[in-house]
Amino acid sequence: MFKRILVAYKFTPASRKALEKGIELANDNGARLHIFHALDYRLKSLDESAPELIEISEETKLRFQTEAESLLKGFNNVTFGCLPADPALETCKIARLDKTDLIILGSHQIPEQSYISRVDYVGMTILEKAPCPVMLIPQ
């Protein structure tokens, strides 16, 4: 059913749940999984060869590897990318260019009201502009 799945990742518990679901669906469907993390938009003014941007990108990739290694458990049809960008618009752009079948997002729950989940501005923008279905995963 799905051949290309994109997880918008923010290093939060909600994003971790979204990643878990993305891995599960990619495994079940034999799909390729791409995880995207938007770096601070203000870094966009730097040249891509700027030492500061290279260092932040490498640190982010290492952090992802460290946090996700236990979840991936041998699943290797996965890529991770990060760059300075508007998180919502870049997620939709990646989905469009890659012909993504499904975008997966985490939604945050209010601790006192676990039956209520919320989606922030980035999530709402993705829901409005996505070129494919979007799946929301509660925390």
Predicted regions: what is each one?
Residues 96-139:
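Gly/Ser-rich helix-loop-strand patches that form or flank binding pockets
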Residues 3-49:
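Small/aliphatic-rich secondary-structure junction motif
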Residues 1-17, 75, 79, 102, ...:
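Intrinsically disordered or low-complexity boundary/linker segments at protein termini
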Residues 23, 69, 124:
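Active-site phosphate/pyrophosphate- and oxyanion-stabilizing loops and adjacent acidic/basic residues
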Residues 72-103:
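Structural beta-alpha unit
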Residues 24-27, 93-96, 128:
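Solvent-exposed polar/charged
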